[in-house]
């Protein structure tokens, strides 16, 4: 298939005791390359393709030593870093940047002036779990970077329906505890900020748990000047569950969702779009593109 040099530093995620996004990207990438039998080297230039996963200052210095023709960079790029200007001003320094999803690509193009044809969407692969669901309660609430009053409204709603729930807050769980909680839930209620990929949410899908998502429409993390259309579920289709945006749509959306709760197939969605096989193929396409 091809052979890749991966560049990353564990210090990039070392501040975090629990699993986090940047660490998970590397972990899942290694697992997917192993599964698909793609040879790789770590932090040495041994093969033709260079994949620089983190473009912090260390990554920036590393970049200056690499063969650039077959170099792709991302998904960990912070657009507000001074050294990122180098990438914009010198598109010949890399084959492509990678973004985890379309809205992030749109952000780079519309707000930071990057050329559309120098950016490729590449989500990291999601494990396809062979779990037997063991349902012991109704709803797992996944709550991250949203307002307390929104969480309270959802809890009140679930109480009014006599549905039991447990809550998982971002950063507050180990991986095994998280998987057990997910596997025991009948469904998941997602109250989430914007996600560039949403790996934890996709793991919930991959375990076959349907989701009702209270989505949002914009990225406002850096204020008005950088406002762009965005979402908490960048990878989604009707097999995954139901979506609403305003609290007054909750009752109607939930009624529909709950009536067809056994007809969703989130696991099938992951297998078709985000499996290790599919995402490694996508990565090799980016490297091999003309």
Residue ranges of model-derived segments:
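Conserved catalytic-core segment of nucleotide-activated headgroup transferases in glycan assembly
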Residues: 17-18, 124-178
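Active-site proximal beta-strand in glycosyltransferases
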Residues: 50-81, 98
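A conserved, positively charged/aromatic
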Residues: 86-95
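Donor nucleotide-sugar binding/catalytic pocket of nucleotide-sugar-dependent glycosyltransferases
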Residues: 96-106, 114-129
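A short hydrophobic beta-strand element within the catalytic core of glycosyltransferases
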Residues: 188-189
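Catalytic binding pocket for nucleotide-activated donors in carbohydrate/polymer assembly enzymes
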Residues: 196-273
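Aromatic "clamp/platform" in nucleotide-sugar-dependent glycosyltransferases that forms part
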Residues: 193
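N-terminal pre-catalytic "stem/leader" segment of glycosyltransferase-like enzymes
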Residues: 1-62, 277, 281-290
């Amino acid at each position: 298939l091809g052979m890749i040099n991966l560049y990353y530093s564990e210090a990039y995620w070392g501040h975090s005791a629990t699993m986090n996004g940047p660490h998970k990207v590397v972990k899942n990438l290694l697992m997917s390359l192993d599964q698909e039998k793609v040879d790789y080297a770590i932090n040495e230039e041994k093969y033709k393709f260079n994949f620089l996963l983190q473009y912090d200052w260390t990554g920036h210095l590393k970049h200056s030593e690499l063969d650039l023709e077959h170099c792709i960079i991302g998904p960990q790029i912070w657009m507000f870093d001074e050294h990122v200007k180098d990438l914009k001003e010198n598109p010949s320094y890399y084959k492509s940047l990678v973004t985890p999803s379309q809205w992030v690509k749109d952000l780079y193009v519309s707000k930071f002036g990057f050329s559309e044809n120098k950016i490729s969407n590449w989500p990291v692969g999601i494990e396809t779990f062979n779990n037997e669901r063991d349902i012991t309660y109704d709803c797992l609430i996944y709550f991250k970077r949203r307002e307390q009053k929104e969480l309270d409204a959802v809890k009140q709603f679930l109480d009014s329906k006599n549905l039991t729930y447990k809550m998982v807050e971002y950063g507050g769980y180990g991986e095994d505890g998280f998987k057990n909680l997910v596997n025991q839930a009948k469904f998941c209620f997602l109250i989430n900020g914007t996600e560039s990929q949403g790996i934890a949410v996709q793991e919930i899908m991959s375990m076959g748990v349907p989701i009702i998502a209270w989505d949002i429409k914009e990225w406002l993390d850096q204020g008005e000047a950088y406002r762009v259309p965005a979402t908490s579920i960048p990878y989604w289709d009707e097999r995954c569950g139901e979506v609403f945006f305003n609290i007054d749509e909750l009752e109607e959306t939930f009624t529909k969702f709950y009536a067809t709760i056994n007809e969703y197939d989130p696991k099938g969605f992951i297998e078709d779009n985000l499996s290790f096989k599919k995402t490694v193929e996508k990565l090799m396409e980016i490297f091999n593109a003309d």
